[in-house]
Amino acid sequence: MSGVQTAEAEAQAQNQANGNRTRSRSHLDNTMAIRLLPLPVRAQLCAHLDALDVWQQLATAVKLYPDQVEQISSQKQRGRSASNEFLNIWGGQYNHTVQTLFALFKKLKLHNAMRLIKDYVSEDLHKYIPRSVPTISELRAAPDSSAKVNNGPPFPSSSGVSNSNNNRTSTTATEEIPSLESLGNIHISTVQRAAESLLEIDYAELENATDGWSPDNRLGQGGFGDVYRGKWKQLDVAIKVMNYRSPNIDQKMVELQQSYNELKYLNSIRHDNILALYGYSIKGGKPCLVYQLMKGGSLEARLRAHKAQNPLPALTWQQRFSISLGTARGIYFLHTARGTPLIHGDIKPANILLDQCLQPKIGDFGLVREGPKSLDAVVEVNKVFGTKIYLPPEFRNFRQLSTGVDVYSFGIVLLEVFTGRQVTDRVPENETKKNLLDYVKQQWRQNRMELLEKHLAAPMGKELDMCMCAIEAGLHCTALDPQDRPSMNAVLKRFEPFVTD
């Protein structure tokens, strides 16, 4: 007897034995069809399942026919909900009940999905929903699951090495925290498959590399955990330790999925302008990701370095252009290296990291999503993710995801780099009602030289042409209509006359 059938049979036996339940309530719990689920509940359930991207596991578990699987896949490619189509087929054509769906979720260990529909099944089945998060030691002995998570749900966060989400909540060393494999059906073998060519590092080595997680080696602290400087195998590394401080189980799952997302994509794409991931550790006290240490800090920090207590020299015009060029190359690689474009989703100065030679590398891959097959196509997603002030209006307002999202974000970065202003800065006093983009548009028409960073000598000759080319590219990248934005390849072609490497 299958796991689904076993759960149903046990529930039915318990219902028959329970004489205190009313006949009408028992009848509802056992026979309510999936198609009768209230629309808000169904919408929430589909959004959750789509975020986990588990429709293939669901289809496999119930043995849908190949043509039905193809039908679901086709709906997903059109930007529609794959989970909703699964429910249409399995719940509609075959008239399955909510209780059967609950049993299916139990079999695949989709515990949060079980919670979403628990009010529509017998209370006797509620005992199958785990009350607490399993610990690392419990999961190490747990069997593998065929369910997997391909893309974490689109919640905004800063999960890169820069760890720009500065949540100062503390945690103790003995606190029980979930590992990468403990939530969202991410098991050890799933993580290891995603990191096939990546080194799995012994936790004790990382503990030793950081002098026992010494506070002196801590580079930053955020909502997802802490980042430490370490010396491992004679390499200077940055080690991100996952603490998952949120008390909310759903939020813990989001954080875990984003960590898995980062592991999956940083391992599968290698480029000079994409942050190098050296290895991972999931069998010790806390899950860890190990990166190349970027000694130059973030672009955001360098752009504000003149305001620091120990100020650094302002980046030169040529350095600003080189950083912009390298970032553009990294984004172009993400968009074109695979059959399906990868959309970073959170391009901003805080996620552009610099090595000791000021060469840029894009970090924070927790929000990367696979986009539509074509570079100029659009897919509608369930939630907006990323840093909103860097996101285009069609994504913020209508959740329309395309490579144009990254292009727009890069355009804002270009304007920040060459004007020396942050997107959140107030523009000059007589222009207080204008944001950075509106201000640049106005000055571009009236007095272009006023736009340039004031902490540097005014550029001249070819250097001036280079700066104006970059600002103009920033304006084109931030066009309101995504169809008017250039591709990253077109941006690189604009930069070609000024490339010296």
Curated annotation (Swiss-Prot):
Residue numbers binding ATP: 219-227, 240, 348-351, 364
Keywords, alphabetical: ATP-binding, Cell membrane, Cytoplasm, Kinase, Membrane, Nucleotide-binding, Serine/threonine-protein kinase, Transferase
Q: Which InterPro entries match?
A: CR_Ser/Thr_kinase, DEATH-like_dom_sf, Death_dom, Kinase-like_dom_sf, Pelle_death, Prot_kinase_dom, Protein_kinase_ATP_BS, Ser-Thr/Tyr_kinase_cat_dom
Q: Which Gene3D superfamilies match?
A: Phosphorylase Kinase, domain 1, Single helix bin, Transferase(Phosphotransferase) domain 1
Catalytic reaction equation(s): L-seryl-[protein] + ATP = O-phospho-L-seryl-[protein] + ADP + H(+); L-threonyl-[protein] + ATP = O-phospho-L-threonyl-[protein] + ADP + H(+)
What are the positions of the active site?
D346
Ranges where the record places region Disordered: 1-25, 144-176
Q: Name one GO biological process term.
A: intracellular signal transduction
Q: Where is the Death domain?
A: 55-121
Q: What class of enzyme is it?
A: transferase
Name the residue ranges with Low complexity bias. 7-18, 149-167
Q: Which Pfam families does UniProt cross-reference here?
A: Death (PF00531), PK_Tyr_Ser-Thr (PF07714)
Q: What is its EC number?
A: 2.7.11.1
Q: Where in the cell is it found?
A: Cell membrane; Cytoplasm
What is the superkingdom listed in this entry's lineage? Eukaryota
Where is it mostly found?
Answer: membrane
Q: Where is the signal peptide?
A: none
Which PROSITE patterns has this protein been placed in?
DEATH_DOMAIN, PROTEIN_KINASE_ATP, PROTEIN_KINASE_DOM, PROTEIN_KINASE_ST
Cellular component, GO annotation: cytoplasm; cytosol; nucleus; plasma membrane
Subunit and interaction comment: Interacts (via Death domain) with tub (via Death domain). Interacts with Pellino (Pli).
Q: What does this protein do?
A: Plays an essential role in the Tl receptor signaling pathway that establishes embryonic dorsoventral polarity; the signal directs import of dl into ventral and ventrolateral nuclei, thereby establishing dorsoventral polarity. Tub recruits pll to the plasma membrane and protein-protein interaction activates pll.
For this chain, the family text in UniProt reads: Belongs to the protein kinase superfamily. TKL Ser/Thr protein kinase family. Pelle subfamily.
Q: Which PANTHER family match?
A: CYSTEINE-RICH RECEPTOR-LIKE PROTEIN KINASE 3
Q: Please identify the protein, giving its name as recorded.
A: Serine/threonine-protein kinase pelle
- UniProt organism field: Drosophila melanogaster (Fruit fly)
Q: Which gene encodes it?
A: pll
